[in-house]
Design a protein with these regions (language model features):
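Acidic, proline/glycine-enriched N-terminal capping motif
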Residues: 1-67, 76-77
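Glycine-rich, small/acidic residue-mixed loop/short-helix segments
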Residues: 206-213, 228-318
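Acidic, low-complexity central loop/insert segments
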Residues: 17-20, 25-28, 71-188
Length: 318
């Protein structure tokens, strides 16, 4: 049987193809103030984002808690697309629209106007080669955004987001289930926020400062002071880790350590079954101290979670 740290050749082969992304949606910001408006709302620089390129960003409350995470794609000088979890789209659109005031920008739900597909393995590599995460290639109105790769037994499996108008032909390749895509997302160590963990984390608790999701040099945005203070004062005590579990986990589920059985020390962010049937892998955000004491699902006596190597290095506290 494969150990959690060593994935099987069959799983490598499974991560090659095209997946529908029915759980993601699109918000469109259009107008001459679109970039300036979003720059003042999100954790990353939008003003300096070139047309045809993308960035990861967080949309936070005044207390710095993430209300959504977004893949920001600039398709024209006055048009920006925000790809996010569909279960957060309506409330995110409503809150962003509340801040528009006199800005010359219109925020709309554009999910029905765009096709979203996840590309894995050769399908992603053909379009993007060895491009760094968030690099974007435009092809006659369609966009391929390089995502963080899945890492299986020290082998990187390319991942990409394909975004195109509804009239465009779909990308060719073997059809993959959304469950396989979700597992590949877990194994990349980078995920988009979903409703079960709404306002559960500041961006650094999902490692966003280490994967291009936070710009500490940009101006103010909701929650900016909390996010910056956590980084500059070295007060980060929670991070996201990659784990293997013998049992199924659900986003928002509490995780405990026997050293403190009465209080949850971590939260499940995203979980998916391994394609070979050998258990589950998950992203869990928890205290650095508790990671070393052992995590258990649901209760301190629950199934033990095995820490796996994170696929990327964490940015040291500034």
């Amino acid at each position: 049987m494969n150990t959690p740290a060593n994935t099987s050749p069959a799983q490598h082969l499974a991560l090659n193809g095209v997946s529908a992304l029915p759980h993601w949606g699109v918000i469109q910001a259009q107008g001459e103030d679109a970039a300036d408006f979003l720059h003042k709302q999100l954790s990353n620089d939008v003003l300096l984002l070139p047309v045809g390129q993308s960035r990861l960003a967080a949309f936070c409350s005044a207390k710095g808690r993430m209300q959504a995470s977004l893949i920001v794609v600039k398709t024209a000088p006055d048009t920006i697309l925000l790809v996010l979890s569909l279960d957060l789209l309506a409330q995110t659109l409503k809150r962003l629209s509340m801040f528009v005031l006199r800005a010359k920008v219109k925020m709309t739900d554009a999910t029905g106007q765009w096709q979203l597909r996840g590309l894995l393995g050769d399908r992603a590599k053909v379009l993007l080669g060895d491009a760094a995460p968030w690099h974007t290639v435009e092809m006659a109105g369609a966009y391929a955004v390089a995502l963080y790769p899945s890492v299986l037994s020290n082998v990187q499996v390319p991942r990409a987001l394909w975004l195109a108008p509804i009239s465009k032909a779909l990308p060719e390749g073997p059809e993959l289930s959304s469950e396989v895509w979700q597992w590949a997302e877990v194994m990349s160590g980078v995920t988009l926020l979903t409703q079960p963990v709404f306002e559960a984390f500041v961006p650094q608790m999902l490692n966003y400062e280490s994967v291009g999701g936070v710009n500490f040099k940009k101006g103010c945005y909701p929650g900016q002071e909390v996010v910056a203070r956590s980084q500059f004062r070295g007060t980060l005590k929670r991070r996201t880790a990659l784990v293997h579990s013998p049992v199924s986990l659900t986003p928002g589920q509490d995780v405990f350590t026997p050293a403190d059985p009465e209080q949850a020390c971590a939260t499940v962010v995203l979980s998916a079954a391994r394609p070979d049937g050998q258990g589950f892998d998950a992203l869990v955000s928890g205290t650095l101290e508790s990671m070393q004491k052992g995590w258990h699902a649901g209760t301190a006596e629950g199934a033990a979670l095995e820490l796996l190597p994170l696929p990327y290095p964490l940015l040291a506290d500034i």
